Every structure is written in C-alpha cells, then in structure tokens.
C-alpha cells in the first residue's frame, strides 16, 4: 500500500497506517503497556488521559528493541527517537523478575502500579501479539523474546509453543533458536531468538499481513486465511 516514490502518500480509508509501519508498531500487549503509561502520567498530572494515535505507538517504542530494520528521527542529523539508554533492554538474568512483573501487571486491575509498568515498558512495548512478553539480552549480546505465561491461559501455552517449534525444526523449516524455561507454577516461559537481528545488525522484514494488504484483526470471516500466504 506504500508506493516506491518520494513525496506525500495517503492510506486507504479502511486502514489507519501503512503496513510497512504497522510492522514496527506494538500490538495488543505493547499498546496496553503504553496506554497504562499515559493513564499513569495523566493521573499524576491531574489530567484526563489523551487518546493515543497509531503514530504515538509507532514513535514511542524503545529504539533498541524495535521490530525490524526501520528507525525514526524528526531531524536528518538528529538522534533516533526513543533511544534513551535508561531504558536499555534487560539482561537474561532478569527473566524471573520480568515474569513476576508481567503477572503482577495482569493482576493489577487498574494497571496503575508504576513499579511493574516501568519494568515492562521498554522491553515489552515494542513487540507484537497479545501475550505478555519482553525482549531480553543473552550473554552473547543477541536479542531474544520471552513470552510469559498469562493468568488467562487455559493450558501451558509456552510449553506447546516449544512443541510446535520442535515440530517445525523436524519438518526442515528455517526457524530461530528457541528454549523453554519455567520460573513459576503459572506455566512455561517460551524464549525465541529475534529473527530480525544478526548480532547488532537490524534486518528488514515484512509480515504476511502487510504483503497481503490486510489489517490487524482480519480473519476467516472476511476471507482471510493462511491459504493466501
């Protein structure tokens, strides 16, 4: 939906953002964290929370953990946006603490506990999907995604993700390295190496949703299916 020429372009009426940028945006979990941050800011300032736009989600993601190869700045010679080292991606050794923060965040009905929010915001807001998750740095400096168990799980989702990953390997599919760890009785944390990084180099990617011109939430009801891929 974004054409290869310089100048202004306009999105179709049924979409809010070009697909190439949507791939760099947080999904439901990341948006939830960023909404909670705005609610907390507004509460402390005695204001009403402002409605966050897609551009707020796109540009508010912590730069180091942003998905894909795109980075953003407002001035050609300026700094990249959201690049504050105060929010650096946490190390592998903090996984247990991050899982506990995600559990506490889910159990906090109003979601205004600043302690849990600060721990999760930078490593978790950049990622897609609805599950609680965070980016972590392995000892070799590689970026991984940790997908934590959720209080809404009806089964051990992380363990089954590992099973599906192993099946993919057995089928000869090219999939990133993955691990399964258990830090609590709630379930298994599924860990997978980021496919959009080779050491410190960022890898551009385009999702099937973008390539097919779809938008988030599309499903079989409107004719969307894996057969199109």
Name each model-derived stretch.
Residues 1-229:
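Phosphate/dinucleotide-binding and metal-coordinating scaffold of catalytic cores
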């Amino acid at each position: 939906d974004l054409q290869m020429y310089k100048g202004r372009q306009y999105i179709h009426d049924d979409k809010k953002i070009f697909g190439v940028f949507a791939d760099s945006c947080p999904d439901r979990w990341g948006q939830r964290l960023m909404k909670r941050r705005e609610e907390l800011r507004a509460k402390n300032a005695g204001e009403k929370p402002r409605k966050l736009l897609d551009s707020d989600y796109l540009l508010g993601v912590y730069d180091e953990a942003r998905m894909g190869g795109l980075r953003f700045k407002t001035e050609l010679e300026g700094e990249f946006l959201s690049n504050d080292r105060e929010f650096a991606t946490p190390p592998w050794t903090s996984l247990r603490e991050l899982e506990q923060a995600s559990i506490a965040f889910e159990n906090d009905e109003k979601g205004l506990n600043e302690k849990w929010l600060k721990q999760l915001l930078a490593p978790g807001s950049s990622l897609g999907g609805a599950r609680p998750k965070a980016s972590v740095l392995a000892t070799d400096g590689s970026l991984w995604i940790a997908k934590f168990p959720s209080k809404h799980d009806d089964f051990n989702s992380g363990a089954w993700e590992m099973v599906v990953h192993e099946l993919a390997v057995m089928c000869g599919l090219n999939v990133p390295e993955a691990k399964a760890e258990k830090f609590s009785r709630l379930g298994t944390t599924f860990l997978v190496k980021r496919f959009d990084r080779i050491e410190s180099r960022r890898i551009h990617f385009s999702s099937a949703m973008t390539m097919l011109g779809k938008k988030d939430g599309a499903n079989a009801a409107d004719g969307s299916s894996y057969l199109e891929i």
